[in-house]
Amino acid sequence: DSIDSQESTLTGYTTYALFGIDHRDKNTALGGENSDTIIIASVNNDTKDVKLVSVYRDTLLNLGNDTYSKANAAYAYGEAEQAITMLNTNLDLNISEYATVNFNALTTIIDDLGGLDMDMSYAEIVHMNNYCVETSEETGKDYTPIELPDRPDDIEAVQYHYHLNGVQATSYCRIRYTASLDMGRTERQRRVIQMIVSKAKSAGLGKI
């Protein structure tokens, strides 16, 4: 009975794979683009609540063809189809739907939704400003650098609040040189996606 009950509950969810690619990050051995962002999104079909889980890009996994490598290499090997096979093979999932975005797509989505309000640390502001230069060049979109506040004793403390445009929020997602390293980077990515989902729910149909 417990198994039947669990299966009944799980049918109320749809699971998607989300990939973020950087066209500059070519896998020279495989010839394609690595997916440096890999997120599994589980959507409650009734409430539309979204749960997100990140797969760290350097995780050693079976790419789905009995070849073991870093998880981000599956996309370079066979694009989204191979990356989904990798997730299904290693995590016992049955994902068939996915979305892939690059810098330009993400900045456009965020700008169309009017930007995002973000709580940040001093360290995040510094790194985001640095990444913005490159993100702006890649997308052709403008931004205004955030003026640094006085340096606090704890540069990792989240104590500043800013409204970010698409270039800034995308650059925020790229940060991986704070004390939390890649764990912090994936957490920031999930935070941005949750904000996008929340704003999309409340936006008019034209914006969605």
Specify the residue positions occupied by each region the protein language model found.
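Non-catalytic, solvent-exposed segments at the cell envelope interface
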Residues: 1-208
